[in-house]
UniProtKB/Swiss-Prot annotation:
Function field: This protein binds to 23S rRNA in the presence of protein L20.
PROSITE patterns found in the cross-reference section: RIBOSOMAL_L21
Record carries keyword Transport: no
Subunit structure comment from the entry: Part of the 50S ribosomal subunit. Contacts protein L20.
GO molecular function terms noted in the UniProt entry: rRNA binding; structural constituent of ribosome
InterPro entries assigned to the protein according to its UniProt record, in alphabetical order: bL21-like (IPR028909), bL21-like_sf (IPR036164), Ribosomal_bL21 (IPR001787), Ribosomal_bL21_CS (IPR018258)
Gene Ontology cellular component terms for the protein in this record: cytoplasm; ribonucleoprotein complex; ribosome
Keywords carried by this UniProt record: Ribonucleoprotein, Ribosomal protein, RNA-binding, rRNA-binding
Gene behind the chain: rplU
Family in the record: Belongs to the bacterial ribosomal protein bL21 family.
Protein name, as recorded: Large ribosomal subunit protein bL21
Pfam families on file: Ribosomal_L21p
GO biological process, one term: translation
Organism of origin: Lachnospira eligens (strain ATCC 27750 / DSM 3376 / VPI C15-48 / C15-B4)
């Protein structure tokens, strides 16, 4: 059984037992989070949402939080001496999928 969920402006294909990194959520480690934007569920028969599957939820437990590797943003304009270097580290929340309710 697997499902496609939407969170943080992105879509993730998940199965029970999977560990995924999603955009930062305002939760603590050990908490339980429920994703109710389930776009697709396949448990032997496919259920496609319009836009979401009615009554379907995905329950996950929060493993931890962190920050991704640094991405360097470098701006440069020739002949003017203009250059600018900036770094960015995106925060994420790591969750473990416990149950898919469809």
């Amino acid at each position: 059984m697997y499902a496609i969920i939407a969170t943080g402006g992105k879509q993730y294909t998940v199965s029970e037992g999977d560990t995924i990194r999603v955009e930062k959520l305002a939760v603590n480690a050990g908490d339980t989070v429920t994703f109710d934007q389930v776009l697709f569920v396949n448990n032997g028969e496919a259920k496609v949402g319009e836009p979401t599957v009615a009554g379907a939820t995905v329950t996950a437990s929060v493993v931890g939080e962190g920050r991704d590797k640094k991405v360097i943003v470098y701006k440069y304009k020739r002949k003017t001496g203009y250059h600018k270097k900036n770094g960015h580290r995106q925060a994420y929340t790591e969750v473990k999928i416990e149950k898919i309710n469809a």
